[in-house]
UniProtKB/Swiss-Prot annotation:
Pheophytin a binds at Q130, N143. InterPro entries: D1/D2, Photo_II_D1/D2_sf, Photo_RC_L/M, Photo_RC_L/M_CS, PSII_PsbD/D2. Photosystem II (PSII) is a light-driven water:plastoquinone oxidoreductase that uses light energy to abstract electrons from H(2)O, generating O(2) and a proton gradient subsequently used for ATP formation. It consists of a core antenna complex that captures photons, and an electron transfer chain that converts photonic excitation into a charge separation. The D1/D2 (PsbA/PsbD) reaction center heterodimer binds P680, the primary electron donor of PSII as well as several subsequent electron acceptors. D2 is needed for assembly of a stable PSII complex. Its main location: plastid. The keyword Metal-binding applies. It comes from the Eukaryota. The gene is psbD. It catalyses: 2 a plastoquinone + 4 hnu + 2 H2O = 2 a plastoquinol + O2. This is Photosystem II D2 protein.
């Protein structure tokens, strides 16, 4: 019996090989297999958003004007979520709600589910693109792993949170002012700023900004040759012929500043990767908790004492009152379909307001 060792070669290329050759060809803009998911989804998501913000009203879903056509600007235009009565319907154009009528589909909020779902798959396609290119050029896939952070936040906020609530209605609409309203909603109804997962997210994002600034400045500092250039404005001249980067010099500098410093490039850069990605993932987990209506910290003893003693007040009790105000005034106008009417005596009052 003879065993042949060596690379297996096909006599002729099949359809997969032809597709693979074309998709992964070296060109100005790499396509790849991931591009089959990324490019159509990104095109439809961005195109749907521009269409919605330009032409489509939110009168039938939120009682609002939300398009340039109605007088909104870039900060106030939005692609709004469907009405609460539509619950978690995918709102397919050919579905039972719109029945193939494009105008009716837009009025019902179909563009929101269109943008949200294509946007989610577009982001996933972009992460797969980074995996594919890393594999092609023999890199480790840390870029793709890092990009899982933004994907986790997008999916948790725009998809998982409303799935835990009564409908897509409670997701953020796609617009600047709409996102601000959603943030106020999160604070008033979930006390989001006192949620430990939000705290970890803030620490991760702001900590990453600090680390990025420190790292960029340190590398810039050590890219220039020794000499009098360090003491004059010539130190800011970017035309030096070759870099003179020195990890040892940077380590010595920060050792003197803080008493401790990174001595290993890999650990340093992994830390700069780890801080923001972990922060984003923690935020995403927190939003999943909110989908299930899990509560933030409650300091009940302070609330009881504040209720009993008019002279006792903390920043926490003031914020709790403020949240009650947000709920009372926001719910009535934010959910007009509920016909909520709050009599004057139940509206919150106190020093916080």
């Amino acid at each position: 019996m003879t065993i042949a060792l060596g690379k297996f070669t096909k006599d002729e290329k099949d359809l997969f090989d032809i597709m693979d050759d074309w998709l992964r060809r070296d060109r100005f803009v790499f396509v790849g297999w991931s591009g089959l998911l990324l490019f159509p989804c990104a095109y439809f998501a961005v195109g749907g958003w521009f269409t919605g913000t330009t032409f489509v009203t939110s009168w039938y879903t939120h009682g609002l004007a939300s398009s340039y056509l109605e007088g909104c600007n870039f900060l106030t235009a939005a692609v709004s979520t469907p009405a609460n009565s539509l619950a978690h319907s995918l709102l397919l154009l050919w579905g039972p709600e719109a029945q193939g009528d494009f105008t009716r589909w837009c009025q019902l909020g179909g563009l929101w589910t269109f943008v949200a779902l294509h946007g989610a798959f577009g982001l996933i396609g972009f992460m797969l693109r980074q995996f594919e290119l890393a594999r092609s050029v023999q890199l480790r896939p840390y870029n793709a792993i890092a990009f899982s952070g933004p994907i986790a936040v997008f999916v948790s906020v725009f998809l998982i949170y409303p799935l835990g609530q009564s409908g897509w209605f409670f997701a953020p609409s796609f617009g600047v002012a709409a996102i601000f309203r959603f943030i106020l909603f999160f604070q008033g109804f979930h006390n989001w700023t006192l949620n430990p997962f939000h705290m970890m997210g803030v620490a991760g994002v702001l900590g990453a900004a600090l680390l990025c600034a420190i790292h960029g400045a340190t590398v810039e500092n050590t890219l220039f040759e020794d000499g009098d250039g360090a003491n004059t404005f010539r130190a800011f001249n970017p035309t030096q012929a070759e870099e003179t980067y020195s990890m040892v010099t940077a380590n010595r500098f920060w050792s003197q500043i803080f008493g401790v410093a990174f001595s290993n490039k890999r650990w340093l850069h992994f830390f700069i990767l780890f801080v923001p990605v972990t922060g984003l993932w923690m935020s995403a987990l927190g939003v999943v908790g909110l989908a299930l209506n899990l509560r933030a910290y409650d300091f009940v003893s302070q609330e009881i004492r504040a209720a009993e003693d008019p002279e006792f007040e903390t920043f926490y009790t003031k914020n709790i009152l403020l949240n009650e105000g947000i709920r009372a005034w926001m719910a009535a106008q934010d959910q007009p379909h509920e016909n909520l009417i709050f009599p004057e005596e139940v509206l919150p009052r106190g020093n916080a307001l």
